Amino acid sequence: MTTHDSHPSAHTVILRPAGGLACLPTPFASPLRWDPLGSLVMRPWYDRLAVNVVARWYLTLSRAWAAALASGGDPASFAGELGLECLPQGLCGWQVTRGLAATTTLARVHAGAEAHWQDVFFGAGAPSDATLVAAERGRRRSAHNLMAARRHFSCLRKRIDPLRWAIPRPAEMPPMSALQGDGGTCIQLPGEPSAFPAVELSHWVPGPYGRQAWLRFAAPGLPGDTAWAQVFEPVGVANPPTLISLHGICMESEHWGRAMDSVDVAPALALKGLRVIRPEGPWHGRRQLPGTYGGEPAMAQGPLGFLKLFRAWGAEVAVMIDWARRQGSAQVALGGVSLGALTSQLIAVAAKSWPAELRPDALVLIACSEDLKDVAFQGSLAAAIGLPARLAAQGWTEADVERYLTLMEPRGEPAMAPNKIVMVLGEADDLTPFSGGLALARRWQVPPVNLFLRPQGHFSVAFDLARRPQPLDRLAEILGSA
């Protein structure tokens, strides 16, 4: 199999809205988008560093941050959330006490900004573009400040675990029959489309890629929860094709500053004539469970956590596909990065038995694998957070894991033809190991023109799409928008 990387990138540009106070700002342009810096940094050494930073810094600081939010600023409650007898003394104790107060204040400010944002964007009437822009910028700023409060707890990173582990023993798992979904997967269509939850669309606001809005609806797989998605739509394109782009674990782009937007390049496809739907995955962002950080429950519960996440997200994607069709999209693609790719490949198999209008027409998988046992037992991030040891401590054997992996791996055939599948794999990927992604590409007969093999690792192959966007250009060609 070969790559398509030698081909020049297409640059079809759709009308871009004017800037100013009545338009959301353009994301910061990362210097990694240009050579020589991009070619020097986006290499396997970057991935080794990234795994270490994520496991030993980001996740541990996130654990402390989540405990701070759950404690309401109370030091004793905070220590209890983290399994500490008491707060440390000296400079670290002073830093943590200060951080608790700051986090509590920032959480209160953000709650107010979020409530105001929802009133403006989903309220009655017709707010001006300037009002919408101000509300979104205020929400985004307050969310970023709250997320960045993790820094206050850096002195605790060697004293706490990266996750609040809650892996059930194999005997405590639900029966397989309760987890079985469509196509041999754990994903199940949430009823007939006529019974899908009503989707509420916010007011549109001008943005750097056209116009954007938000969707929300009752999450069909998580009672009491609300599913959210951001929509980026091109200007001057009637009934554009749609891409539903799923994010990776712990990725919460909408809650960080504009610099984070340079990492997620999918919204820029609106400039090539695509509508892009960017969902907020279960247990991420607005959907964080109390006392947890974004994505933590999936990892902390081991196989059960991922089974629940895949099942819930798959049901939500079905609702979004239905919504996109009702907006006039004849072509709907599905895809994602890392966790988003693992979810998308499962949906692609499950959807083969769904009604034709709910089947995605194309698929883009970035940093994926068909072998989740390899991901769980050999993957670099799983090893760095101690997942194999935690599973063993709860009595899990590889055979136990394998039994449930049958529901989480794309063992069947996808709903779309091979020439409608685009895959991007890092040959040095050891988080979702490369061999599992290549095996899936071969089994699904992805044609060489759609398979991009790059000498990179898990993070670099995804982040480098801003500099080398040929796979996304290829997807646009397949959908007929380029």
Residue ranges of model-derived segments:
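Short beta-strand/loop motif that positions the catalytic acidic residue
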Residues: 416-417, 423-425, 429
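Short alpha-helix in the alpha/beta-hydrolase fold that links the catalytic acid
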Residues: 259, 346-347, 419, 433-443, ...
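C-terminal catalytic histidine-bearing segment of alpha/beta-hydrolase fold enzymes
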Residues: 438-482
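Acidic catalytic loop of the alpha/beta-hydrolase fold
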Residues: 371-372, 427-432, 458-459
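Hydrolase active-site cap/lid region
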Residues: 346-396
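N-terminal targeting or regulatory segments adjacent to alpha/beta-hydrolase or S9 domains
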Residues: 1-211
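Short, surface-exposed "cap/lid" segments of acyl-processing enzymes
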Residues: 220-290
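Alpha/beta-hydrolase active-site loop
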Residues: 290-327
